[in-house]
Structure formats: structure tokens, C-alpha cells
């Protein structure tokens, strides 16, 4: 991802955190390492972390040598899921909430996976892929686990649709895994077909009991007056695929009001205001360049201090027409372009141009911060 893509994914992750840790619920953020501790048996599945020279030295003794067993046994295993690392924090989480259920743990991080055989250039080699994933592990009593699964399904589907231009492209389907455990998949309808962006599943207590063998008493949480081993509800999202979904969702071809040519359309990336990497572009129009840039710099500092992301177009040295700037900023999904001109020096008025409506309005420079803050906040609360 480049700068804009990285900012888009960061904004999506920030919105995920806001939804995963609602004020009324006991959900805590954790951060497990990328790889597990050494000691996994040689035959255990998983991607190993090895220095090439160490592996070469071990292989010189033959493929089944004790040296190779030692090397594989001391290698860390790259995580393919956030779940084991999150579940390892369950007992500590339980103490924080005085053993009261329900409660939850959440993490965002990179996970690794073997690429499908169809994507391998050599059938004898296995390539490794990575993805940025989100996980909410929700611990509830077995009695209410089904209700909580339905609750999180509604919440998550509503969340994905909230930021979409075409909400109906996000859908859900139910399934049962090989062990009969119930779950749901949330999909996005891409041009080439439907792909999963998030999976919800009631894991029961199996994973917890495997994580803490012989220590089931540590797992007991309070459900009213009863002590129970909770069921784990896993809400596992693919943020990289989510970014791709919103890029496809927001790309629109609109009529170009700046030209009379037939079949002339402008490309607009109409990302939701909360997801747009940049909220504002600052540019200068006619007037004394030095003074106008000083005004832009002051406004840039004020907006960024208030966490409004700004593109400093006024620093550009290659001249461009307003039409070219509008096209560029629409494709960058910038919500507003602010034009500072000699009129700003005279009376403090700037021109504000909207990405979504292409309408231009005049506004006093002192009102910009509050206007932009309210605009993004109101979009978030819809």
C-alpha cells in the first residue's frame, strides 16, 4: 500500500476499534506477538521462522537428521490466526472484570498463510502470503452464546454497510463447520464474484480448554450466581479485503460539469468521510504567492492540530488549472478543496469546493475548523 492506501486502511482499523470496544461493554485491546514460542514438534503444521544459514547447516546432515529436528524445534511458528494469542490473555482478562461475563478481547495484526496451489509458480515450493486481520473474541455464558452471536451479526453487517455507497453489496450467509459449530460469513459482491470480509463463529469452549489443559477452574466466569466455562464467539475480519471492497464500492463515474464534450465523465472516489485518507486540500489562487502560502501554512497547522488530514497543494511548484486540481482531488477522494486567494487577504473569505456535489461556496476562514469537524462527526454518527 502507498501513502493513501495505508491511510485508508488505518482509518478503517480506527473505525473497527470504535465499534469493537463500545463504551458499555467490557472489551480490552491486546497485542500478541507475530510468532509463537519455540518448541512446536517438527510434524506440527505452521509456517516456521528460520534463518537460511541455520537451515542449510541442518540440511547438510540429511533431511531426517537430529540437527534438522533441533532446528525445527527451536524455530518460532508464524501465526496464521490471532485467536491463540488472544485466548492466551483470557485468564488475565477475567481478573480485570472480576470474573463477570460477558467480556471480550480484541486485536488487529498481520497473519500469514500458505498461498493456494493455483498461485504457486513451482509445485515443490510453498509461498507465504500475509493479510491484516481483526479479531474480537467475545466470552459469554453458554446459555446466551446464541443470542450474542445474532447480536454481533447484526452489529457487524450494519457496520460494513454504514460506510458503503452501495450497502446492498454487503450480505451475510450462515454455515456450520465440520464440528457442527454455527457461524456466519459477511460477504462483499466484487465484479468477479462474492468474497468473505468477515467470519463470525461460536467456537464453544473447545479452544479455551485446549489452551489451558487441566486448568479448567481458571476459566470459570460468573453468569449471575452460576460459575461457567464461557463459550468463545470469534469475529474475524480481513481488513485488506475490506479496503479493496470500499475502493470498488466508492469508485463512481459522474457527469463532468466542466466540459461540454459528449460521453465525458469524471472519476470520483466517494469514500465515506470517516474513511477518506485526506479530508481537505489547500491550494492558492490569484494573489501574492508568499502571503497566500503563509495563510495556507497557518490553516494547515490549525487543521492538522485538530486531527483533520490535509493535502498541502499550495506547496506544488508545477502550475495546474482548477479543473486539473478538481480531477486530481476527486480521484484521491479528498472531501473538500479550499482555495486561498487575494480575497482571503482582504476579508478572510475562502472558496470551499465539495467532492460529492462539486458545488462551491464562500466561507470565512475562521469557520473552517468547526465546519469540517462537524461534517466528519455527523457522517460518523449516521
Provide a role label for each language-model segment.
Residues 1-382:
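NTP/phosphate- and nucleic-acid-binding module
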Amino acid at each position: 500500500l502507498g501513502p493513501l492506501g495505508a491511510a485508508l486502511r488505518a482509518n478503517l482499523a480506527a473505525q473497527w476499534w470504535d465499534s469493537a470496544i463500545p463504551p458499555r461493554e467490557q472489551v480490552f485491546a491486546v497485542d500478541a506477538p507475530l510468532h509463537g514460542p519455540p518448541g512446536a514438534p517438527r510434524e506440527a503444521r505452521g509456517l516456521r521462522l528460520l534463518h537460511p544459514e541455520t537451515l542449510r547447516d541442518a540440511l547438510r546432515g540429511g533431511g531426517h537428521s537430529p540437527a534438522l529436528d533441533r532446528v525445527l524445534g527451536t524455530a518460532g511458528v508464524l501465526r496464521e490466526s490471532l485467536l491463540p494469542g488472544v485466548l492466551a490473555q483470557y485468564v488475565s482478562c477475567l481478573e480485570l472484570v472480576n470474573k463477570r461475563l460477558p467480556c471480550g478481547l480484541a486485536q488487529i495484526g498481520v497473519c500469514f498463510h500458505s498461498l493456494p496451489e493455483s498461485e504457486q509458480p513451482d509445485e515443490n515450493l510453498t509461498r507465504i502470503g500475509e493479510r491484516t486481520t481483526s479479531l474480537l473474541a467475545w466470552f459469554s455464558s453458554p446459555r446466551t452464546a446464541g443470542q450474542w452471536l445474532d447480536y454481533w451479526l447484526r452489529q457487524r453487517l450494519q457496520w460494513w454497510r454504514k460506510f458503503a455507497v452501495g450497502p446492498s453489496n454487503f450480505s451475510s450467509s450462515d454455515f456450520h463447520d465440520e464440528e457442527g459449530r454455527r457461524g456466519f460469513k459477511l460477504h462483499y459482491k466484487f465484479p468477479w464474484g462474492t468474497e468473505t470480509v468477515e467470519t463470525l463463529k461460536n467456537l464453544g469452549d473447545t479452544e479455551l480448554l485446549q489452551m489451558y489443559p487441566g486448568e479448567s477452574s481458571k476459566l470459570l466466569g460468573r453468569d449471575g450466581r452460576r460459575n461457567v466455562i464461557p463459550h468463545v464467539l470469534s469475529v474475524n475480519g480481513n481488513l485488506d479485503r475490506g479496503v479493496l471492497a470500499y475502493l470498488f464500492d466508492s469508485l463512481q463515474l459522474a457527469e463532468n460539469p466542466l466540459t461540454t464534450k459528449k460521453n465525458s465523465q469524471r472519476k470520483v472516489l466517494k469514500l465515506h468521510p470517516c474513511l477518506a485518507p485526506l479530508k481537505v486540500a489547500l491550494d492558492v489562487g490569484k494573489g501574492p504567492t508568499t502571503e497566500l502560502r503563509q495563510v495556507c501554512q497557518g490553516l494547515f497547522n490549525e487543521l492538522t492540530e485538530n486531527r483533520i488530514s490535509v493535502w498541502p497543494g499550495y506547496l506544488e511548484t508545477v502550475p495546474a488549472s482548477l479543473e486539473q486540481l478538481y480531477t486530481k482531488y476527486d480521484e484521491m477522494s479528498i472531501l473538500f478543496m479550499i482555495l486561498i486567494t487575494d480575497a482571503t487577504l482582504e476579508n478572510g473569505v475562502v472558496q470551499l469546493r465539495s467532492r460529492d456535489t462539486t458545488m462551491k461556496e464562500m466561507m470565512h476562514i475562521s469557520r473552517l475548523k468547526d465546519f469540517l469537524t462537524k461534517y466528519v462527526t455527523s457522517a460518523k454518527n449516521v
